[in-house]
Regions:
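Extracellular beta-rich ligand/substrate-recognition surface
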Residues: 281-291, 328-334
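Aromatic-lined ligand-binding clefts that engage carbohydrates, nucleic acids, or primary amines
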Residues: 44, 268, 296-324, 353
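Beta-strand-rich ligand-recognition modules
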Residues: 59-82, 313, 321-371
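An acidic-aromatic loop/edge-strand motif
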Residues: 92-159, 192-277, 345-402
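Bacterial Sec-dependent N-terminal signal peptides
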Residues: 1-22
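A conserved hydrophobic secondary-structure block that centers on an alpha-helix together
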Residues: 152-191, 196-198, 302, 307, ...
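Ser/Thr-rich low-complexity repeats and stalk/linker segments
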Residues: 22, 28-101
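Short beta-strands within extracellular/lumenal beta-sheet-rich domains
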Residues: 27-31, 286-299, 337
Length: 402
């Protein structure tokens, strides 16, 4: 009995050791990835120290041993474009691998902007795209001042399809298609971008040595407690600002709400939305809330259908109402304003569109050369650039501590 128990325990211990020694790969080395052609390619990961690791790719084996820190790496020789192929790393099997050209795309919001945000101009092209030879991976957002990460969970490769195309970086989407047309080899896009990020945030500690002020900031943010304090402080300041704006907005609390059709706005100023004749005091931009009202004529046939209200882009945030009913909002300046208007809201004849525009600092504005209209497919009613205008609440510029 003791012999059997010892045998069972030995088997369990061996199984436990085998499972613990399992090789691990970073998320970006996964199904559907693209490897760079005609260059040596590194495959890496983690395992228990001393673990034997064998990579098999295109019928060739490459072996190594995990080091004292558990890390291992093998280098594949230069390869011609092609695929799809399979790869095994010990007991891990990766499928649908291509060899072609891999491009790193990086930057701020212009690179991060998705193809789904440019469907106004490229709807048909994006809706019909299918090319399994183009692959895309977006590096998840995150920061860590304690050193580079070994892995980035969530960095998953996707092929170009009509379902995935809207998730691609718009710039990278058109670039990848052009490169494939020129080369006819698989294209892999690695998008590592973060809107509004500073170049210093992407620099290593070594690279910052020549910039004492930025290096000092980096040293400050090396403290988890300091970063948390800054984040809490910024969030608290924003809450105070938002609360003060809400309480001080005459359009929300001064009798009839300014989004209501029954409000008498005859004493409101009439302004051109693209001019500088509104939103200023003594020649300087006014932060806070700005209210705009415009009446739009809709036919009986149009009123019986759901519409899309397009309001270009605005600086900074907005809430939009049709006939006093909320239809949508956006919290920052860059996205196109595209709001669905149910058929039940619209009526034949005059319909009131109201915009409550919030400006955090600098000049509030509507971006010109964008669509401003009610649309039912190709049937549209353009909005005038002339609106009734009233300042709701003047505020100091909103600032963040970080």
């Amino acid at each position: 009995m003791k012999y059997k128990l010892a045998l069972v325990m030995s088997v369990l211990c061996a199984f436990s050791a085998w499972t613990e020694a399992k090789v691990k790969l970073p998320a970006i080395l996964s199904d559907g990835m693209v490897l760079q052609r005609e260059r040596p390619v590194k495959i890496w990961g983690n395992a228990d120290k001393g673990e034997n690791v064998t990579v098999v790719f295109k019928k060739k084996k490459f072996s190594t041993v995990a080091g004292e820190d558990g890390k291992w790496l093998v280098e594949l020789p230069p390869m011609k474009a092609g695929g799809p192929f399979e790869m095994t790393v010990n007991d891990i099997r990766l499928k649908d691998i291509l060899v072609g050209d891999v491009w790193l795309c990086s930057g701020q919001s212009n690179m991060e902007l998705t193809a789904g945000r440019v469907t106004d101009k490229f709807a048909e092209e994006i809706a019909r795209d299918e090319n399994p030879m183009i692959r895309y991976v977006k590096i998840p957002l995150g920061n860590d001042l304690h050193g580079p990460k070994d892995d980035l969970p969530g960095a998953d490769w996707m092929p170009l399809t009509k379902e995935t195309a809207p998730s691609f970086s718009a710039l990278a989407y058109f670039f990848a298609k052009e490169m494939y047309r020129e080369t006819q080899v698989p294209v892999g896009i690695v998008n590592s971008s973060w809107g509004g990020s500073s170049v210093e945030a992407w620099m290593s500690e070594e690279a910052l040595q020549k910039f004492p002020r930025q290096l000092h900031e980096r040293d400050l943010f090396d403290s988890d407690e300091y970063r948390e304090l800054c984040n809490r402080s910024g969030q608290m300041m924003n809450r105070f600002w938002d609360t003060a704006l809400y309480k001080g907005d005459r359009g929300l609390h001064d009798g009839i709400c300014w989004n209501r059709p029954e409000l008498d706005d005859t004493d409101w100023q009439t302004v051109d939305m693209f001019s500088k004749e509104w939103g200023r005091k003594n020649g300087y931009p006014v932060s806070g809330s700005h209210w705009f009202r415009q009446k739009v004529n809709v036919s009986a046939e149009q009123a019986g259908k759901e519409a899309v209200l397009r309001l270009g882009c605005m600086v900074d945030a907005d809430s939009v109402f049709v006939n006093g009913i909320f239809v949508g909002n956006t919290f920052y300046q860059y996205p196109p304003r595209i709001y669905r208007v149910p058929a039940s809201i619209l009526k034949p004849g005059e319909n009131l569109v109201t915009v409550r525009l919030i400006n955090y600092g600098g000049a509030a504005s509507f971006v010109p050369d964008k669509p401003y209209c009610l649309a039912w497919g190709i049937d549209t009613v353009r909005l005038s650039s002339r609106w009734k205008y009233q300042l709701g609440c003047e505020m100091p510029a909103r600032t963040n501590s970080v």
